[in-house]
Amino acid sequence: MGGFERRGVRQYNRSEVPRMRWTEEMHRQFVEAVECLGGQDEATPKRILQLMGVKGVSISHIKSHLQMYRSGSSNSNHPVSLQKLTSATVNNISKREFVNSEDRCIYASGDRNTASSDKNTYTILRCGRSSMPSIEEIFRNWEQTRGRLLPWNSNVITTEQATTRASRQTTNYSKPLKQLTDCDLTLSIGQLWDDAAGSDADGSSTISEEVAAPSRDEAFVSSADDHFAAAAAKKESNMLTTDLNLDLTISSSWLS
């Protein structure tokens, strides 16, 4: 037994005497014997067994039945019936049952006097690996205990919903890319730019410069010429910019 004992678990030693099913008649005889002996506090199992005189009933059966009878009638002045005594016994046995944490998943409250809104905070979750609760169940339990009016999953996005949204966005982005393949764009530039580009493209334009050491007067004239040349170049650039024409041709298949 030492290998199967668990720390913190109270061992329950069952009696070797076989169980016996109490009938209404046997319980009535038991109650009459208890009353004849002066009540439940004065009656002893041995005297009760002698007064009952029922075959197949041992003193161990009388002891256990008397203990349950005392616990059931402690809060009542009237004799307890067999039905109430049986239900009370079942409740006591169910409280002592050990629930295997590997096979079942239960929520057991540690304090019964706490408010209903705070029970979930002090709830002890004992769950096996094969029955792990989902995030939806945890949020549903949390919302229901606090009486929220909003749906429990109003702000929760599951994995399936996130996957669906991502696929929809990918489809929406891919459609414009497919449609743009049928779009034809034509850029036409003014005559001044065409002439300049054509001369550079065929390599026919050449630039020859002769550099000489300028004198003082020539340097002054050269700086003035550079100033007027820069102003003229800026004005010419503005004129070229205004001469830029952009023609956009879109095929009819893309518009449809």
From Swiss-Prot:
Record's subcellular location: Nucleus
Expression sites (tissue/organ): Highly expressed in the pulvinus and stem nodes. Expressed in the plumule of germinating seeds, coleoptile, leaves, internodes, leave sheaths, spikes and roots.
Single GO molecular function: DNA binding
Disrupted gene: phenotype observed: Increased sensitivity to cadmium stress and increased accumulation of hydrogen peroxide in leaves upon cadmium treatment.
Gene name per UniProt: MPH1
Annotated ranges, domain HTH myb-type: 14-74
Record-level GO cellular component terms: nucleus
Listed NCBIfam families: myb_SHAQKYF
Name of the molecule in the record: Myb family transcription factor MPH1
Taxonomic source organism: Oryza sativa subsp. japonica
DNA-binding region: 45-70
Induction line: Induced by cadmium in roots.
Pfam families: Myb_DNA-binding
InterPro entries (UniProt xref): Homeodomain-like_sf (IPR009057), Myb_dom (IPR017930), Myb_dom_plants (IPR006447), PHR1-like (IPR046955), SANT/Myb (IPR001005)
Task of the protein: Probable transcription factor involved in the regulation of plant height by elongating internode cell length. Involved in the positive regulation of grain yield. May be involved in the regulation of genes related to cell elongation and cell wall synthesis, which are associated with plant height and yield phenotypes. Plays a role in tolerance to cadmium stress.
Keywords per UniProt: DNA-binding, Nucleus, Stress response, Transcription, Transcription regulation
